Amino acid sequence: MSTLSSLYLGSEPTQVTVEGDQLLVTLADGRTVTIPLQWVSQLSQTEPLPGETQLLILRRPPRVDHVHVTDSALNVYLQDGRMLSCPLAWFPRLLHGTLAERNHYQVLGEDDVIHWSDLDEDVELLRLLEGGKSIESERSIQRWLMSRKVASSAKVAAG
């Protein structure tokens, strides 16, 4: 992994620093690009930048068009024609959901959040672009699975 990734500004970054609420990127050609920190995910002005920093800078935020969930992958189709795919195992609630539950989703926000109300799961597009998976704890998943089992048993007993 390189220390800094190319920003496609005609020159390679040579230094990245945080000053106040701005990210300053100094380029090899001497130019400095200033980016508001709120545009850069998971950085704050109080935390030092990690030794190896990669930046993903987008001209326009991507938008979700539709979603297709298979038994092994979450496939997110973007409005610009691209498709983003990641392992379904990254999202345990989707992995354990039924086909009907997986297919019952809404695109929220500015077309950048996918919400499955039946599974109580939200996936942010930016998190997928960063290669991030669910951060829900194993304990929380186990409680959720147990509550599903209890609800399923109650339906069978009532029916």
Kindly label every feature range from the protein language model:
Residues 1-159:
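Motif-centric detector for short Cys/His coordination patterns
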